Amino acid sequence: MPLQVIEPTLEDYSGHCHALVVSLVRATAGSPVDLWSGEGSGAMAFGPDVTIHPLFRRRLRPLQMLRLLHRLLRRSGRIVVTTARTRDLALLALAAPGRIPPDRVFLYFHWVRETPGKLRFFRAIARRQPDIVILGTTESVVDVFRRCGFQHVALLPYPAPETMPSTEAQPFRRLLYAGAARQDKGFGIVVDLVELLAARNEQVPITVQVTPDHYGKYDAATRADIARLEAVRYPPLALIRQTPTPAEYAANFPGSICLQPYDRAEFRDRVSGVTLDALAHGCPVITTAGTWNAAMIEPFGAGIALAGPDAESLRAAAATLRADYARFRDGAFAAARARGRESWAALLARLRR
């Protein structure tokens, strides 16, 4: 029976969803997979073992998810929701014909915003469906579910991409902002940096991705920042206006310094696929201290974590990394290798039972 993998937001090759599914398919090593994904994913390819079901539309997603779970829970086979949300627990409780047995349904939570109301909800679901397997990216995520009474909770660090040893010799080429243009990812600070570089007549190459989020939208602040960026006269600036293919996206990292001045409150315990992609390609990272990103780079000397990133501190940190790029690049590869050894182990152990 194929493994039933559900990733409703997977629409194309952008974002973390694609890399996550690729990593899981690689880890399951030839086992058949039914992939239930967004309606725009039909033309994607994950290899001969994966059957794509392009099902989900954004506005209908909760209802479609409920119907899908209702159907799958009445068949044999295991179900993995690779990017789980609180709502998925409620839908499972509604869809299940009875108590879900152990090792049947796996929900992978990347982060949890802990509130009193959410904790009460988790406790209620744990009493009703204690055998749902909860996987979490960090200790603090899994601790929430353990405290709420779920009996099968495991740490599964966010899977790392394969490292790219052929890029180890790349010298510094440019600064890079990769991923969707978003305020919580410090896009405005990166625009401030470009303005500063232009004002000081510097010639440091910088590439900035200005594509929207999964839903093709920008908020007002980001639109204003893009307008500012387009108005800057800085010849070494290159803009990525279209969502890159996987190959194009990967090619951005070797020789780059990845700028991630992410919001500390939002990313204190929230995984960044861009960080993992950067490290896999030997790309050092500049990020915000006290974030998940910082915890990935600091033990390995894979970049610099800033207490309060702004344009001036980004510029100074970039100069430090450029001056000793080979050492920081090696640290990035070391961080990626350490992360890769942990990928999917907690899930695979249960699937083999």
Each model region followed by its residue ranges:
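Conserved donor-binding/catalytic core segment of Leloir-type glycosyltransferases
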Residues: 6, 166-185, 190-198, 206-208
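A charged, aromatic-enriched C-terminal amphipathic alpha-helix characteristic of glycosyltransferases
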Residues: 15-16, 308-316, 322-352
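Short beta-strand->alpha-helix junction loop in the catalytic core
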Residues: 111-112, 140-141, 155-165, 212-214
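A short, glycine/small-residue-rich beta-strand->loop->alpha-helix junction that serves as a flexible
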Residues: 5-22, 183-185
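A short, active-site helix/loop in glycosyltransferases that binds the activated sugar's phosphate group
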Residues: 114-153, 295
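Nucleotide-activated donor-dependent transferases that construct or modify glycoconjugates
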Residues: 1-14, 177-178, 261
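Nucleotide-activated donor-binding/catalytic signature segment of Leloir-type glycosyltransferases, i.e.
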Residues: 129, 220-250, 257
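Nucleotide-sugar-dependent
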Residues: 260-276, 288-290, 294-295
